[in-house]
Amino acid sequence: MKVLWAALVVTLLAGCQADVEPELEVQEPAVWQSGQPWELALGRFWDYLRWVQTLSEQVQEELLSSHVTQELTLLMEDTMKEVKAYKSELEQELAPMAEDTKARLSKELQAAQSRLRADMEEVLNRLSQYRGEVQTMMGQSGEELRARLAAHLRKLRKRLLRDVEEVQKRMDVYRAGAQEGAERSVSAIRERMGSLVEEGRLQSLPSQPLRERAQAWGEQMRGRLEKVGSQARDRLEEVREQMEEVRGKVEEQAEAFQARFKSWFEPMMEDMRRQWADLIEKVQVAVGASTAAPSQKS
């Protein structure tokens, strides 16, 4: 029996020691201090979150309002905007790569971006939840709520760091692919130029100097440019004729409408003038008759 009690005491002491054992601090990524713009933006989000995690009196006061979540939201949007801009920049450099490779890399990076954004949004949701819990208190003390929040924020920071590292890895793969594609493109251009030079050297004849070949090439290019210019002028003239035709049709329709409107409006006005004249004449006759009646009575 004493052995069982001793074992129980040892177990309880070990559990208490495990509860109070300090948790290892998340290592701060040094690359955020001098990295890409998206890494610097993410560093600002990280620093602000670290300040929130201190749960100082100022932090606790600001957590009761929406100031902290609004600030973190702005930092999150700034970070994701920089990530998107850097991804677009790398995608432009990936042009020489195969389409299936580009699609695969883009899909992997997009998934890492989504996880990173989800981590940030979960931080915002947890802080909003804490504000609601403090306002209601739901039978819990403020110390308990702060302890739960601190533990949850530590887990979220670890997850955030893990997903940030994943985004960095995908960005590195993107960057390596862009460099490889650029080198492959330059190599292909160099080989093509070398083959053209060699071909020109083999085909050159002693009776045809390089200057004559250059002049012939220039005449050929001039002819092509003149042909293109002539085609462009013809097309422009065709468009101009079409515009003139459209304008003529519009003017014709406008004149026809004006004529129809005039044929409808003028008879109506003439009829109104005639009716008005008849009305005036009747009024004058009536007035004259009323004036003549007293004269006859006298």
UniProtKB/Swiss-Prot annotation:
Residues of the signal peptide: 1-18
Sequence repeats: 74-95, 96-117, 118-139, 140-161, 162-183, 223-244
Region Specificity for association with VLDL, annotated ranges: 260-272
Post-translational modification (record): APOE exists as multiple glycosylated and sialylated glycoforms within cells and in plasma. The extent of glycosylation and sialylation are tissue and context specific.
Keyword Transport applies: yes
Segments for region (8 X 22 AA approximate tandem repeats): 74-244
Modified residues (Methionine sulfoxide): 137
Pfam (any one): Apolipoprotein
Major localization listed first in the record, in broad terms: secreted
Residues that bear Phosphoserine: 141
Keyword entries, A-Z: Chylomicron, Endosome, Extracellular matrix, Glycoprotein, HDL, Heparin-binding, Lipid transport, Lipid-binding, Oxidation, Phosphoprotein, Repeat, Secreted, Signal, Transport, VLDL
Classification via InterPro entries: ApoA_E, Apolipoprotein_A1/A4/E
A GO BP entry: cholesterol metabolic process
Intracellular or extracellular location(s): Secreted; Secreted, Extracellular space; Secreted, Extracellular space, Extracellular matrix; Extracellular vesicle
Region of interest called Lipid-binding and lipoprotein association, as start-end residue ranges on this chain: 204-272
Gene3D superfamilies: Apolipoprotein (1.20.120.20)
Assembly notes: Homotetramer. May interact with ABCA1; functionally associated with ABCA1 in the biogenesis of HDLs. May interact with APP/A4 amyloid-beta peptide; the interaction is extremely stable in vitro but its physiological significance is unclear. May interact with MAPT. May interact with MAP2. In the cerebrospinal fluid, interacts with secreted SORL1. Interacts with PMEL; this allows the loading of PMEL luminal fragment on ILVs to induce fibril nucleation.
Family: Belongs to the apolipoprotein A1/A4/E family.
Function summary: APOE is an apolipoprotein, a protein associating with lipid particles, that mainly functions in lipoprotein-mediated lipid transport between organs via the plasma and interstitial fluids. APOE is a core component of plasma lipoproteins and is involved in their production, conversion and clearance. Apolipoproteins are amphipathic molecules that interact both with lipids of the lipoprotein particle core and the aqueous environment of the plasma.
Protein name: Apolipoprotein E
Organism: Dasyprocta punctata (Central American agouti)
Taxonomic path: Eukaryota, Metazoa, Chordata, Craniata, Vertebrata
Gene that encodes the chain: APOE
